[in-house]
Amino acid sequence: LGDVPGTSGAVFVARPESKNPDRFGLFGAPPLEEGYVVLVGDENLKQFPPPSEFLLSVWNRSRAARLVCCSIVLCCLCLTVFLYLSENMGQTVTTPLSLTLDHWKDVERIAHNQSVDVKKRRWVTFCSAEWPTFNVGWPRDGTFNRDLITQVKIKVFSPGPHGHPDQVPYIVTWEALAFDPPPWAKPFVHPKPPPPLPPSAPSLPLEPPLSTPSRSSLYPALTPSLGAKPKPQVLSDSEGPLIDLLTEDPPPYRDPRPPPSDGDGNSGEATPAGEAPDPSPMASRLRGRREPPVADSTTSQAFPLRTGGNGQLQYWPFSSSDLYNWKNNNPSFSEDPGKLTALIESVLITHQPTWDDCQQLLGTLLTGEEKQRVLLEARKAVRGDDGRPTQLPNEVDAAFPLERPDWEYTTQAGRNHLVQYRQLLLAGLQNAGRSPTNLAKVKGITQGPNESPSAFLERLKEAYRRYTPYDPEDPGQETNVAMSFIWQSAPDIGRKLERLEDLKNKTLGDLVREAERIFNKRETPEEREERIRRETEEKEERRRTEDEQKEKERDRRRHREMSKLLATVVSGQRQDRQGGERRRSQLDRDQCAYCKEKGHWAKDCPKKPRGPRGPRPQTSLLTLDD
């Protein structure tokens, strides 16, 4: 304790030691009951040291004190962090978007099953920034509502410049998550609502409950139950908008045949009897809206045969607007028989037309020659009792008559005849739409630059149906269709499909999925232009470099040749000088240097010409330019 302030010169007196030397007090001090230390300070010290200085000295000297203090501080810090995280975690909100990001591996697996690839960054961008701008109610945090997903999908798949092909893999994956949710997404998927029950005509508060309806509502009616009829309700003025909504599309026709009375009396007798309250002003206004002239109503969506409010089949003919729209919005039978056949098939299934309606439909959508060809093919499809096509006139006329039959749609036998007639008519449309066999037409169907493999396959199958007698859906024709799909696909897709491993064991569905994957990984037009520009620049740079190298090589070759030429000239001159020196050194003492004869010297040579010396010719030197 010599370092403790104020203890200089102190006398330390220790009590007797404890009998148990292994026991220690706090911070290593002996226990209280075993003795204590008396500190006697300096007599001259007037003021005792403060306790803080004593504690600091203990902190500096005792390792146990430091360990205990650090442990207490660490525990407090951990407790604070735990409480903070608990409060924040309790306030976290899970959204469909965050849920998909937390299970991104499963999302990628589902996308791979759909033969598409998705990226997390674009997933977030489309969900939070792109799809909310479609004005279909898509929230920024995403949703698993099937209706909203379907509306966004329609926007994405829109043809022309309004579509978004780059968003197709992402909305397809969203749709797969909603319609086939994994376990972690099932609690967030909206349950599929049951199909809404169409309101029945007698349930409207405008007619007395016991009266027989004189006209049917536009909306499908329910068969009346066997129980007691509900009491009619009188709507208040606040419910006026509901009544307006129900009467937006009034029925265009009155019932030409009043339904049989069920014993409750007609509506004219029921109203004065006082069984129903007087109609309200809103109901009067509604009745006024529902009773315009029949000829002005041309926007009907009603079926020719449908169940009325009393459970009886009622007849509603086609409206002129429906026939007009079907004719103008579809190609002719000669141009595209498949599309028009599909339209007529849907009409036959949903509208359940009578014999007269079928003739009206064929007369509107087909030309005279096309109609005769369809009727002829339909009569050829009539089968006899043995199940094989028959040519017996009585059986053919009974199944597919050319004159108006007396089939009553209110009876079971009449409805059976109508069903058979519609089936034969559909078979006649399919057979009449086939052109003569022309395989060249099938081979001429090729995939467009921006056409998806699925759309191309549909066009190819339609060509098979139209120009060949084969059915592309037949398993025996799958190999031929698959080979045509590979050979007539786009060049980049066809090359990759031909290099697939185990190609002979691939089904047509496998080839389509692989083609879709290749199609989705194609570069965009902007990327293609950038690649072409970059390749052009690289080619120009490479050509310029090659030209510079060739020019440098040509200069080096020219300098090398000139150097060789100069070296040859210089060496020849040197040899000439050396040769002249050697010849001059070989002359004898009395030999002439001019005529090489002995007996005189060159200055006395008689053969040497005399007279003045002419000018010496100028010596020409060879330069690099020569």
Curated annotation (Swiss-Prot):
Residues 195-310, 523-626 are annotated as: Disordered. The keyword Membrane applies. GO terms for molecular function: nucleic acid binding; zinc ion binding. Residues 195-211 have a biased composition (Pro residues). InterPro entries: G_retro_matrix, G_retro_matrix_sf, Gag_p12, Gag_P30, Retrov_capsid_N, Retroviral_Gag-Pol_poly, Retrovr_matrix, Znf_CCHC. It holds the Pfam family Gag_p12. Keywords: Coiled coil, Glycoprotein, Host cell membrane, Host membrane, Membrane, Metal-binding, Phosphoprotein, Secreted, Transmembrane, Transmembrane helix, Zinc, Zinc-finger. Gene3D superfamilies: Gamma-retroviral matrix domain, Human Immunodeficiency Virus Type 1 Capsid Protein, Zinc finger, CCHC-type. SMART domains: ZnF_C2HC. A motif (Cell attachment site) lies at residues 383-385. One of its GO terms (cellular component) is membrane. May be cleaved within the capsid domain. Glycans are attached at N60, N113, N505. PROSITE patterns: ZF_CCHC. It comes from Moloney murine leukemia virus (strain neuropathogenic variant ts1-92b). The modification Phosphoserine is found at S280. It comes from the Viruses. This is Glyco-Gag protein. The chain crosses the membrane at residues 64-86. A motif (PPXY motif) lies at residues 250-253. A motif (PTAP/PSAP motif) lies at residues 199-202. Residues 526-566 form a coiled coil. Residues 523-554, 574-607 have a biased composition (Basic and acidic residues). A zinc finger (CCHC-type) spans 590-607. PANTHER family: GAG_P30 DOMAIN-CONTAINING PROTEIN. Seems to be important for efficient replication in vivo. Disulfide bonds: none annotated.
